[in-house]
Amino acid sequence: MNEIFAACAIASKKYLGLIPYDEQLTAAAELTKGRITEMKTGEGKTLCAAFAASYMAKNGHNVRILTFNDYLAKRDSEWMKPIYDALGISSACILHSTDIADKKEMYKNQIVYITAREAGFDFLRDFVANTPEDCVQTDFDFCIADEADSMMIDEARVPLVIAGETAVKPDEKLPEV
């Protein structure tokens, strides 16, 4: 972990002008263990998440960083990209407006920034896909949720629903009871 975090710190200082604090490194280390960490606004959650995501990606994991909205996904992805590039890690940002063909390619990156809502809808669309080729997501095994409390408590009350035509036609006559 020390070597990867050190490489992240060097890239962060060189390309972003940011030197991580001990608290950020501790929080990043906790994230790599699947633990929740609480950080207030302005304490460097974005950098912390990038360090944890980099560590996991360098160790063979496919990482999703879930944000609250498209603005944060785009901002954080673009801001942290120099760190990922310096470490040879592929990254992408999927927005609500991203078309299906582009999503398929973007999901192949080691680190993907996306809103929790969009990731949820992609999961549902893949679940009802007629063929494996119709699926857009790739497997991932590590997730970092920015604003986890908001996503898991506030947004959990809003269901994700997909509606549309199905390949299966309903019976014209219902059996008599």
Region locations from a protein language model:
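Conserved P-loop NTPase motor core
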Residues: 1-177
